[in-house]
Amino acid sequence: MSDGKSVEKEEALSVNEHLKTDSDFLRGTIQEGLDTAVTGSFSEGDQQLIKFHGFYQQDDRDLRNERKEQKLEPLYSFMLRARVAGGVCSPEQWLGVDEISSTLTSSNSIRLTTRQTFQYHGISKRNLRTLIQGLDSKALDSIAACGDVNRNVMCNPNPVESRLHEQAYYWAKQLSDQYLPRTKAYAEIWLGDDKVATSEGDDVEPVYGKTYLPRKFKMAVAVPPDNDVDVYTNDLGFVAVAEEGELVGFNLVAGGGMGSTHGEVQTFPRLADDFGFIKAEDTLKFAEAVLKVQRDWGNRSNRKLSRLKYTIVKYGYEAFKAEVEKRAGVKFEPKRDVVIGDRGDRYGWIKGVDNKWHLTLFIEGGRIKDLPGQPLQTGLREIAKIHKGDFRMTSNQNFIIASVAEEDKAEIEALARSHGLMGKLITETRGRSIACVALPTCALAMAEAERYFPDFLSKVESLQEKHGFLDQGIVIRMTGCPNGCARPFAAEIGLVGKAPGRYNLYLGASFEGTRLNKLYRENIQEAEILSELDSLFARYVAEREEGETFGNFTVRIGAVSAVIDAAKDFHEQHNHA
């Protein structure tokens, strides 16, 4: 299946490629695995296929050694991620989401993600089907939330420009729906639909074919000046261009991605390239063209080099652009001027142009759970029972109670305050900072992130206060490994797990997310990290220029050099100032 150059043929295909080809369009032996009660696990091959259905197999790493001593298999469970385009859901849907977390997961919590959806942790294999059917009863699903397909499409939740948000969200939803896998495997296995006879790939999967994409694919729609969706970190981004408050089209960007591997310099994070302006009505033509070029040109031999960013680097910007235009049947127009600004959320009440109010709530670590003195989950449940608008999850792991009428504000605020959802002082830095889940559930984590990050941030805030600039926000992000789920390489201060208690410290990304950071210190512990930041903060306060952000400052003084072309200079050695 190809519209142009074919899939890599010079090297042997990866194991995953054979798995997909032989899976009967993502069915594999998942059904048999579900029916096997002797283990809480799926087979090795099915563990790859279940990702396309929206979940990963995990185990509690805190208990691994104990269970091994008891001669028990690891305590297997599953993390399921929903597909919620643009992070928008109704109060009724949220009540269903909430009930599932309380009855079918051991974590008894809901985790908001950095891609505007939610995920559950601690699901046993025997509860998977019941949980997925519960989501389905609320018109929600987990199809393509993971796997080598177009994943959850992000969209700026802009609570002010409601008309523009509505138009941008329309396209985010179109992109999400249009590029869902067409296989009936999900409905058959989880919802009990009758099995349909399968035919060849072009009929079943007209865009993907039977081998789907070489790797995950991420899309986002940004509404300037906000860049909360970190549009340049996506495989494919659409930057809204408006005239007199109406959407006219997008600047298309492509080739971003955060993941890399420690010690392997052929892997690197990368920000997307600007390709030009497209009219709104051509959005799907260009999206499909980019997907198909990646399908046919992407590396299917080495999964570490399979993302679109490596495809563009390999074939070159001009060749890639020409092929996309050829397949779309439309040329790019010159990029329109837009201003890319803040990546943070606007906390508290914001009034939109439609005179409706929107309340953005800070959710530490994106973890919605009842805590001592802060029954957050109960609070959102009570709000959902009375709210007449919708809910919006943000890419900073926060939660918006959207479209609140003036007369309903007081009741919703009272519930938010009485349940600990409002009232706590959030610094500019904490409000812009995110961490991935990491230990104990993520199999890839080398160090803590979510569990440790709040305390670490408190120590950074103390340093900011010591140096007199606590009122200024710094974008800080932490991940347990270099796969980059919390987009650490686009943070002014990035911390990437190397080993338990040890992190690589990255500096120098721009505040707006238009430049990557770079390695400053490797494999260091908390005391060393804080010592380095203490010294840099002292210099920053003494030497900064008017309006200069911390990330820009670290580049100007030579603490790190600017990343201009990630393929060439992200791993370039640098003598620190």
Curated annotation (Swiss-Prot):
Pathway involvement of the protein, from the record: Sulfur metabolism; hydrogen sulfide biosynthesis; hydrogen sulfide from sulfite (NADPH route): step 1/1
BP terms from Gene Ontology: cysteine biosynthetic process; hydrogen sulfide biosynthetic process; sulfate assimilation
Any one of the GO CC terms: sulfite reductase complex (NADPH)
Cofactor: siroheme; [4Fe-4S] cluster
Keyword Heme: yes
Residues that coordinate or bind [4Fe-4S] cluster: C436, C442, C481, C485
Domain of life from the UniProt record: Bacteria
Reactions catalysed: hydrogen sulfide + 3 NADP(+) + 3 H2O = sulfite + 3 NADPH + 4 H(+)
Residue stretches spanning the membrane: none
NCBIfam families for this protein: CysI, PRK13504.1
Task performed by this protein: Component of the sulfite reductase complex that catalyzes the 6-electron reduction of sulfite to sulfide. This is one of several activities required for the biosynthesis of L-cysteine from sulfate.
Family: Belongs to the nitrite and sulfite reductase 4Fe-4S domain family.
Protein name: Sulfite reductase [NADPH] hemoprotein beta-component
Organism of this sequence: Shewanella woodyi (strain ATCC 51908 / MS32)
